[in-house]
Amino acid sequence: MKKYEIYLPLNYSDGQPIESEKITRVREELLAVFGSFAEPYRRAWKYDGAKYIEILKIEIITTGNKVIKKRLKEFKERLKESLQQIDILITTHGIQVI
C-alpha cells in the first residue's frame, strides 16, 4: 500500500486565490478516480516578509501499482495547467496495514 500526499496550492502564482470551483473539481476527480481522500491540514509560512496560507494537503491511500502512479502523473499535469502552477508537489510513502 502507498500513501500519496498532494500539496494543492490555494493561490495562483500572482497571489490571487484559486476559485473554489476549481478546488471542488479537484476533490470530485479524486473521489471518482480513487474512491476516497483525506484533507488533514493546510500549510502556512512566511517568506521575505509576506505571509502565505495556501497549501491544502490531500492524502490518498491506495495500491502502489504502476497504473495508479501513471494516473497521478497525468493528474498532476492537469493540475499544473488548470491551476497555472510551475509544479505541484506530490509525495509517496510506503505504508503497512496492521
Give the positions of each predicted feature.
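Positively charged, small/polar-rich N-terminal and surface patches that mediate targeting and assembly
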Residues: 1-98
